[in-house]
């Protein structure tokens, strides 16, 4: 179904059409136009895994709490989840910790993608090091155009069934909520108060791994959430706005 929605969005983009609200394809987790990197450059990044296979990204908030996207945790039990931290490779190295429980934002809506944020509680504490570090939550949004980065292990091309073994990243620029919902871009009123956008010219508009970090100024400003499957300048990637959702994370950590 997800691939159908992405294909539908690409067709609509090519035709200059508008996809009705409610057909909002989630990011399929790809770093297109990205660069291989090491975990020491993104030590807050984790791989969220279902039954041992990479599923989504996430960010270390504390030794026992991970921030990710609510849409990553649909129809899944905590017992099937684990995270790998401290490794540039999702399938080896670093440390693995089981997920004891998780909580989605109570206001998350799979149709509108509002409040697309969740916290994972680990069964054991992470030991911080040069490759395992917590990242702070943004208390305010960066300015429109501010430099940011997105990292993850997503597929490198649309439609690919394989993912890279090594962590990758792309540099992007923040598109403010007000600008992302303006006539400058194609989303209009689908951009809600719990969202922020980012875009990079010449790179896929669906950067990153679902649930993974959008970082600017050394703090977590966004969680990879959704975007239309069309790498056009008028459709930036859309992220859960961490500054807007900060108090929820703190209260549920």
Curated annotation (Swiss-Prot):
Principal subcellular localisation of the protein: secreted
Record key words, sorted: Disulfide bond, Hydrolase, Protease, Secreted, Serine protease, Signal, Zymogen
Domain of life: Eukaryota
Active-site residues annotated for this sequence: 71, 116, 210
Entry's localization field: Secreted, Extracellular space
GO terms for biological process, alphabetical: proteolysis
One GO cellular component term noted in the UniProt record for this chain: extracellular region
Matching SMART domains: Tryp_SPc
Top-rank EC class of the record's enzyme: hydrolase
InterPro entries tied to this protein: Peptidase_S1, Peptidase_S1_PA, Peptidase_S1_PA_chymotrypsin, Peptidase_S1A, Trypsin_dom, TRYPSIN_HIS, TRYPSIN_SER
Organism: Drosophila melanogaster (Fruit fly)
Sequence ranges assigned to domain Peptidase S1 in this UniProt record: 31-253
Family membership noted in the UniProt record: Belongs to the peptidase S1 family.
EC number(s) on file: 3.4.21.4
Reactions this protein catalyses: Preferential cleavage: Arg-|-Xaa, Lys-|-Xaa
Disulfide bonds: 56-72, 180-197, 206-230
Swiss-Prot/TrEMBL site (Required for specificity) positions: 204
Pfam family, one: Trypsin
Protein name, per record: Trypsin beta
Signal peptide per UniProt: 1-22
Propeptide: 23-30
Gene Ontology molecular function terms on file: serine hydrolase activity; serine-type endopeptidase activity
